[in-house]
Design a protein with these regions (language model features):
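C-terminal motif of bacterial Sec signal peptides marking the signal peptidase cleavage site
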Residues: 15-18
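Bacterial signal peptide processing site
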Residues: 20-22
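A short helix->beta-strand "capping" segment at the edge of beta-propeller domains
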Residues: 30-52
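A short beta-strand motif characteristic of beta-propeller blades
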Residues: 41-48, 89-96, 136-143, 184-190, ...
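Repeated scaffold domains used in trafficking and secretory/extracellular systems
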Residues: 50-60, 100-110, 146-156, 190-201, ...
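Residue position within the beta-strands of beta-propeller blades
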Residues: 64-68, 113-116, 159-162, 203-206, ...
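Structural motif
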Residues: 71-81, 117, 121-129, 167-177, ...
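Short loop/turn segments that connect beta-strands within beta-propeller blades
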Residues: 84-88, 131-135, 179-184, 219-223, ...
Length: 360
């Protein structure tokens, strides 16, 4: 009788397991292999059924990210989805309008979600925003083949991007644009300008004038732009948050000096300090900063205009690391099938670091 009961229970289990195509993802909690004996970095591992993932955010227990599904190549991350970590179910938010699409630069400011819909083998790309509560989607840019946009960013309901136009012509130019998600109005805040970053009510961008580089700082509330002098080197803006910006200075590549130094600048008064931070993938958020290499993540604590290294954590085969909101960082691990005879498998692993739970 016991054997019959056990058999019936086993059959019921198999039947229930076969109902539905969604299964809960594999999640584990592990402690990072830290170089410090005092700090404990516990992170959550989540494995999701996609060939590749980009720009993941963590919103209310769901991963909002761009993914390449089993029927696409690993670079064709054409679906923007909301993935429930607990159940493994997901909803499609947006599908790329391109035959070979790649959704990039997903950002969220607490109300508005934005992204860049890019064509893999062309410069065609357009920016979209969505009211996360109502799910209403608006296409912000509608550019032709002679124009291109850079990575968008958002703060306080205003989207910023650098736009290059008259590409291929005799007068190729760039400008910094801003779009108000509430009023749906677009305006130019700077004629000329490169990479733009935004956070906490401000946007920062670099402008080259006569061989000198300045940092433009746009205040969303006042609508005014102030300029901070940087120098005559080559400068790359990395990120902007909490009234500060990170940028990388490359001395003089034209003269063979490609040495680099990372700086942090106070956007209110222009005071700078050397930021002892790896420039690769450097991101600034709240009281922290993070950068990544192919085999490690580096976490930093910000105290005013100073950054100090918390720890470097070995995290093998890091493809990317992004700020996911609320002092959370997500590292995306390279697909386990990369470089093997079997090729890419339909699974991507991510590590979720919650710095709010950092213990000493």
């Amino acid at each position: 009788m016991k054997r019959v009961s056990a058999l019936i229970l086993a059959l019921m289990f198999l039947f229930l397991a076969s109902c539905g195509t969604d299964t809960a993802p594999e999640t584990t909690t592990e402690q990072a292999n830290s170089a410090s004996t005092d700090l404990k970095f516990d992170y959550e591992t989540v494995k999701v059924p996609f060939k590749s993932v980009s720009s993941p955010l963590l919103l209310d227990g769901k991963l909002v990210m761009a993914v390449a599904t089993a029927d696409r190549t690993e670079t064709d991350r054409r679906y923007l989805i909301s993935y429930d970590i607990g159940s493994g179910k997901y909803d499609n938010i947006f599908e790329s309008t391109h035959e070979l699409g790649d959704i990039q630069s997903i950002r969220f400011d607490g109300k508005w979600l934005i992204w860049n819909d890019c064509e893999i083998y062309n410069s065609a790309r357009n920016i979209y925003c969505m009211n996360y509560k109502t799910k209403e989607i608006t296409q912000i840019t509608k550019l032709g083949n002679d124009s291109a946009v850079g990575e968008p960013c958002i703060s306080d309901g205003v989207v910023f991007w650098d736009e290059c136009f008259d590409i291929g012509g005799e007068n190729t130019r760039s400008r910094i644009k801003a779009y108000d998600c509430t009023t749906k109005e677009t305006k130019t805040i700077s004629e000329g300008g490169d990479k733009v970053c935004a956070g906490d009510g401000k946007a920062a961008f670099t402008v080259n004038k006569g061989g000198k580089t300045t940092l433009g700082v746009y205040d969303i509330e006042s609508g005014k732009v102030t300029e901070l002098a940087l120098g005559d080197g080559s400068y790359t803006l990395k990120d902007c948050a909490a009234g500060y910006a990170l940028y990388v200075e490359t001395k003089d590549p034209s003269r063979g000096d490609s040495s680099q130094k990372t700086w942090i600048i106070d956007l209110s008064d222009g005071k700078t300090a050397v930021a002892d931070i790896f420039p690769d993938g450097a991101k600034l958020f709240g009281d922290y900063a993070v950068s990544c290499t192919a085999t490690a993540l580096w976490f930093y604590k910000r105290d005013g205009g100073m950054l100090s290294l918390i720890d470097g954590l070995r995290d093998t085969n890091v493809a990317d690391a992004s700020f996911a909101g609320n002092n959370t960082v997500i590292s995306v691990i390279k697909n386990v099938g990369s470089g093997t005879s079997e090729g890419l498998v339909n699974e991507t692993e991510m590590h979720i670091f919650d710095l709010n739970k950092l213990s000493v």
